Design a protein with these regions (language model features):
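Residues forming the flavin
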Residues: 1-347
Length: 347
């Protein structure tokens, strides 16, 4: 159909929009830092995404599983999970969320492609929490003969005969394990997309210490952000698999459509307001506002702070920053809050 234009060049486009859906996805972490796995050094130690391309009919090998080093068909394959996930020693405590399932899928497909093959999966815990997920992992073991070994891999090295020795521990049996395989597949942990932090600064939205965008409320507003009109979809908000990403994308689209169906938008009445008599134009509120909702405006020959009502989200950062107490939140002024505290202290 010639739907893809291979000659297309980068183009800068400027548009005015009413809503933005951030769906920046994720990137794989730098797996070469795990030198004990031979990442980037041994040609037959590859990532799960690279192995996925080998399994794909449109991939470089037409769906045939071969070793990158010599093009031979592997008979024994070791899958190592949690490479860069749940690893406090490297400051990576989060679980990538979907590695357990795609590893089981790849082990099943390997058996379909190479019936006389044997797959070994080194894992920490099997986190199969979705619909039908646990049943699928059981099928991988019971019907396809995948051998699961609970424990970390300590080292991978070539044995000199074209194969690789995988050394680890079986924590269930309390013994050392040594497996000789033809190929090793690493389930590499994910991280926030490169450039996500810069985008968050432009959109004026928060992000956590892993770099994933923060939702407005984890239960009640999971696709919204603290900036009105900016929504989240997919892994940019946190680790999730394809069904959850599709569901969140649909929810974000529904939120946008609900805004388009209205003639007028309603803003939260609890916004900041400025007492121009007390304002000395120090500029601290302008610098601290995460939404850019405060500007300078001339009043009787003097510059004063001015709150843009339609932009203010009522977060209250400016009220706690102002040294003169010139900015207050509507229905939550200092006097009102202190009156509530004094009343509570009477009981």
């Amino acid at each position: 159909t010639k739907a893809i234009n291979y000659e297309m060049k980068d183009e800068l486009i400027t548009e005015k929009v009413g809503c933005i859906i951030a769906a920046t996805g994720y990137d794989l972490m730098d797996w070469t830092v795990y030198e004990q796995y031979g990442g980037g050094k041994y040609p037959d130690v590859i990532t799960s995404l690279q192995y996925e391309r080998l399994l794909n009919a449109s991939g470089p090998t037409g769906g045939h599983i071969v070793r990158p080093s010599d093009g031979k068909e592997p008979k024994k394959i070791a899958f190592i999970q949690c490479v860069g996930s749940r690893d406090p020693s490297r400051g990576r405590n989060l679980c990538s969320g979907f590695c357990c399932m795609y590893t089981a899928k790849q082990a099943v497909l390997t058996k379909d492609h190479i019936p006389d093959s044997q797959s070994y999966v080194f894992y920490m815990d099997i986190r199969a929490v979705g619909k039908g997920y646990d049943e699928f992992t059981r099928r991988a073991v019971e019907e396809y003969g995948t051998e699961y070994i609970r424990g970390r891999v300590s080292k991978i090295y070539p044995d000199g005969n074209g194969q690789y020795v995988v050394m680890g521990a079986d924590t269930l049996l309390g013994t050392q394990v040594q497996v000789t395989v033809d190929m090793v597949v690493l389930a590499v942990g994910i991280e926030a997309s490169h450039g996500a932090a810069a985008l968050a600064e432009k959109l004026r939205i928060s992000y956590d210490h892993y770099g994933f965008f923060m939702e407005s409320h984890p239960k009640l507003r999971p696709v919204e952000t603290n900036t009105a009109g900016v929504f989240l979809a997919g892994v940019c908000q946190g680790t999730k698999d394809i069904p959850n990403s599709v569901a969140q994308g649909s929810a974000a689209a529904a939120k946008v459509l609900s805004l388009f169906s209205r003639d007028k938008l309603q803003n939260d009445p609890q916004i900041a307001h400025v007492d121009i008599k007390r304002c000395v134009d120090c500029g601290k509120c302008i610098k601290c506002c995460p939404f850019g909702a405060i500007k300078e405006e001339a009043f009787r020959g003097q510059l004063k702070a001015k709150v843009i009502d339609t932009v203010c989200q009522g977060c209250g950062v400016c009220t706690s920053t102002c040294p003169q107490g010139a900015i207050q939140l509507s229905h939550a002024t200092d006097n009102e809050i202190l009156a509530e505290v004094n009343t509570l202290c009477q009981f």
